[in-house]
Amino acid sequence: MQTPRLNDLALLVARMLLSAIFIKGGWDKAWAYQEAAGYMTKGGVPGSLLPLVIITEFVGGLLILVGWQTRCAAIALAGFTLVAAFFFHWDFGNRGQVIHLYKNIAIAGGFLALFASAAGAYSVDGRRT
């Protein structure tokens, strides 16, 4: 039996899990800037876009974590994740890349579910309603 409290707790845990990979990813790219820029260039994306990628991942992850502007952040990160999947993991000859492709698609699905449900009571958005 689902209760509002259980739903809100599940949304909190979902936000924590979804945000972790983006906060860490943005942080790691900032601290290994040249390596990250090289990886982007190799994938056909200009390295000059790396600051935008870092901000999107790190700030977007923090927004999801605290649950502020959650719907906006969730739809933005869903789109970002799908674009990254197709630029960097669309290689069906490489099993590892295929796994990353489907992982990114699944993460985007999680963000779409978060977009549809909102952040829940245990969030900045939830405290404001």
Task: Map each language-model feature to its residues.
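Flexible, solvent-exposed coil segments and beta strand-coil junctions
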Residues: 43-44
